[in-house]
Structure formats: structure tokens, C-alpha cells
Amino acid sequence: GSQITGVQAPPLALELNTSPVPVPNSVLPQNSTNSPILNRDRAEEVIRTWLSSKAQALGPEHRIEALNAILTDPLLASWQYRARVFKQNNSYQQFRHSVSIESLSYPADNPNEGEITATVREVAKLYRNGQPIQSESYDSTLKVRYDVVRKNQSWRIQEIAVLEQ
């Protein structure tokens, strides 16, 4: 065979931090609450967001608007009402939570709805006029079903049912 000598190709410049072809945004990883697929991580994030929002709405600062980020009606309206009553009664709660996702499912024909079952431990201390009310404070572990729906690219809880105490 013949050989070609004395010919050198220029070095190839290759950067791995950019794509050689444009990648549509829909392919890139998104903020997980915006992700269309209800998987285990998403389910846990939805429940943790709910518990955090609940703690803010019923907490000493009465951040009722926090509920808007995770609940949808009719559940949203009932929790807003509950939070306003707490504020009017000069009451608030402090929470500690732990969550374990037990199962999740969604209909094959509608990935915008789903059901999450979780075991939630809630330790709550109630305060009225700045004083702790022991009789209304509790430490409970509950099995809870959350019915969720995706609205505006974000998962929201539309119904909560306690299955076991």
C-alpha cells in the first residue's frame, strides 16, 4: 500500500460544554416541580412543598399566600379559610414533618393527574396568644392519600384523605 507522508491535519477543536446542535428546551432537565412526569422524587417534592406551605400558612407569620403554590380548589379555599381563622384567633402552629412515599399512580390516558400515598409524621405545637396549648398539640403518624393534578406545568394537590392513623 502507499503511504502519504508529510501531511498533517489541523488539530480538532472540540468543547464538551456546548452542544454542536441546538437542543430544544423541552429536552433539557427542568425544575422538578415543573416536570410532566409524576415519579417518586416529584411525589416527595409535592408532599414536602405542601407540608412547608401548611407550616407557613398556619405559622406565626400567617403566610397564607404560601398555599397558592401547592393547593388547588376546593382544597385551597378550605385551607385559606382555616389559616385566616388561626390568624383571627391569634393562634399559630409549629410543625416538624417526616415523609415516606408509599406509592404513586396515574392513569395511562391522563398523565396530568395522579395519586400519591405517603406515610407522614406530623409533630405540631399549637400556640394561642403566644402560649402553648398542650391539649391541641400532637405527634401523629398518618397514612395519607394525595390526589394531584398538573396545572400550568406545576403539580398541585386537589384532595387529601387520611387512610390510617
Model-found features: residue ranges?
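N-terminal, helix-rich and Lys/Arg-enriched segments in bacterial and organellar proteins
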Residues: I47-R48, L71-P74, E102-L104, G114-A118, ...
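Amphipathic, hydrophobic N-terminal targeting peptides for secretion and organelle import
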Residues: G1-L28
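Short amphipathic beta-strand and strand-loop transition segments with alternating hydrophobic
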Residues: V99-D109
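Generic recognition of flexible, low-complexity loop/linker segments
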Residues: S53-K54, E102-L104, R145
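Generic marker of residues within folded, mature protein domains
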Residues: S91-Q94, Y106-A108, E136-Y138
